[in-house]
Amino acid sequence: MARIFPMKKILFLFILIVLFYSSEAQILNDSLEYRIRPDSARTGELYLSVHNFNYMRNYEYFNKIQDGYTLFGAQLEPQLVYYAHPRLALTAGVHFRKDFGGQGIYKSYPLFSVKYQHGNSTLVNGVLEGNTHHRMLDPIYDFEKKITEPVEYGTQFIINGRNLFLDAFINWKKMIYKPSPVQEQILGGLSAELNLIKNSSMSLSVPVQLTVFHQGGQIDIADDPLQTLVNSALGFKLKLPFSGWIKNLRTENYLISFNDLSFTDLQPYSKGYGWYLNAGFDTQKFGSLMGTLWKGNSFISSNGMPLYQSVSQHIVHAGYTEKHRKLFILRYSYQQKLLPNLYMDFRFEPLMDLGKPAGSRKIEFSNSSFLMYKQEFRLHKAKGK
C-alpha cells in the first residue's frame, strides 16, 4: 500500500499538469502514411513504387480485456504506377505480409486503384488509402490494422486543404456470392477536421469522426441476424507552438459514442460512450510525451482497439464485461528520418487501469518499433521529356 499511494499521487499530478498546459490524442502517424497521387510533371510516365514497412508491436498486457501478444514482421508493397493524365494515376501491384517465425508468406493481396485528383480533392476507387491514412482515433479505428488489415478495398473521397481535411470511405470488408454461408461486411467511415484558427501562435481545430459497420446481406443462408454498429467522435484540438527545446504543447479531447442499431440485441450494451482526454508536448530533438485519460461507459467499437472497450475480446475471457473503464496511458514516441526515403518510429506506452482497486493496480505496457522505406523509380520516360 505504501507504494501504491505515491504512484496515485504522481499520476494524478501529471494528469493535472498536462491537462492544464495542454497533446495529440494519439501519436502522430505522419511517417507511416504513403500516398500515391496524380502528378502533372510525370504525365505519360511509368514508375515502380516500393513501400516497405517493418514492424514490431508488443503488448505486455495481463488484463481480461485485451490479449498480450507480439506482432513481428515485414510488409512489401511493389506497384506499377502509370501517370495517365495530370489528374489521373493508375496503379497495379501486390502486397506481401511476412510474419517472422511463420512459414512462408502469411498473406498477399492484389493491388489495383484508380486515382482522380482535382485541386485539393481526390477520388480513389479500388485499394483505399486506408488504416492510418484515415487519421482516426484508436477507440474507433485500431492503429494495429496497419499490420493486421493493411489493404482495404472500396471507394474513397478525400479533401486535403489548408483548413479542411476530409476522408469519406466505404470499405467492403467481405464480399459474398449466392448462396453464401456467411454474411457480407461493410464499413463506412468519415474522418474530418476543420481548422478554426491556424497561425504562428496558435492552432485550434474541430475533428469529427464516424464509422458505421454493417453485417448482413440478402443472398446468404446464414441464420445470424443483421448487425449495424455506429461509433462517432466529436472534439477539439489545440496546439501552442514554442521556440525552445519544447516545440509545442497540445491538447486533444473527445466525446466518443457507441450505438447498436441492429434489430436484434446481440451486444451486452445497446449504447455507450467514452471521454478521451489527452495532453502533452513535442520536443525539438527528443520525441513526444503525452498523457491519455480514458473514461468509458458501456463502450463497444466494431473496429476500435480492444483495450478501450467494455466487452472483452481476450482469448480466455471472451465476453467478459466491465461496464465502466478508466485508464491512464503515458505515451512516448520518437520519429526520425534516417536517410532519404527511410524513416524510423519508436513508441513506448505504459498504462494503468484506474478502475481497479488501488492495491491491485498493475503497470502494463506496449512498445513498438517501425522502419519504413518509401520510394518511386522511373521505368519509362514520356516522349519529348
Residue positions per predicted region:
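Bacterial Sec-dependent N-terminal signal peptides
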Residues: 1-32, 157, 287, 367-385
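Beta-barrel outer-membrane channel/assembly domains of diderm bacteria
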Residues: 24-105, 110-116, 366-375, 384
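Flexible, solvent-exposed loop segments that connect beta-strands
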Residues: 60-65, 138-139, 307-316
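Short, glycine/acidic-rich beta->alpha junctions
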Residues: 72, 104-106, 149, 184, ...
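Exposed, low-structure sequence patches enriched in small/polar residues
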Residues: 73, 93, 111, 161-169, ...
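Subset of outer-membrane beta-barrel
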Residues: 81-87, 95, 106-122, 131, ...
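Surface-exposed coil loops of outer-membrane beta-barrel proteins
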Residues: 122-193
